[in-house]
């Protein structure tokens, strides 16, 4: 299920598996009174001394390394999710790993590491239904509406065709 939007991640993982790790949570989280099924975070330890050492050790115990980014998903949801729902959740979380680009859309590389500069990206469209109802759609909502008029690139058939279990079974 290749997505060129994530090539910057795939290229890093090819050379350095420590860029990204995945973890299962035993249940969903609740944030702002909404169920959260997945979360992408840039791994940072905002503590000192032994707390930082313990947190780093926990990551090494879990993954064998301390990742730069961690995606955690609700195992209970994933267990019952359709292939499409699961793939969409993972894809959503991967979109939170943004890559800095210049005005021409080219990836910006770090002068120190030579690697692409990444950041934790917010959502493309963050708006309330009531706000749009009252004031109308802003440019990002209008763009989303135009995109939504087209059929999705990925269908159920595409997902089944790329799944090792489905192809073998």
What does each model-found stretch correspond to?
Residues 1-80, 100-169:
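Metalloprotease/metallohydrolase-associated module, dominated by Zn2+-dependent proteases
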Residues 88-100:
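Active-site recognition of the HExxH zinc-binding catalytic motif
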């Amino acid at each position: 299920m290749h997505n060129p939007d994530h090539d910057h991640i795939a290229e890093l993982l090819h050379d350095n598996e420590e860029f990204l790790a995945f973890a299962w949570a035993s249940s969903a989280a609740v944030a702002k009174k909404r169920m959260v099924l997945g979360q992408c975070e840039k791994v940072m330890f905002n503590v000192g001394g032994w707390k930082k050492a313990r947190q780093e050790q926990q990551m090494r115990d879990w993954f064998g390394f301390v990742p730069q980014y961690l995606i955690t998903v609700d195992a209970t949801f994933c267990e019952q999710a359709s292939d499409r729902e699961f793939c969409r959740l993972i894809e959503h979380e991967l979109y939170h790993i943004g890559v800095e680009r210049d005005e021409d859309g080219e990836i910006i590389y770090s002068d120190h590491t030579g690697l692409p500069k990444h950041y934790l990206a917010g959502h493309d469209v963050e708006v309330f239904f009531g706000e749009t109802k009252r004031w109308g759609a802003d440019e990002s909502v209008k763009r989303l509406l135009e995109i939504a008029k087209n059929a999705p690139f990925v269908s159920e058939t595409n997902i089944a065709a790329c799944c090792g279990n489905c192809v073998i079974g």
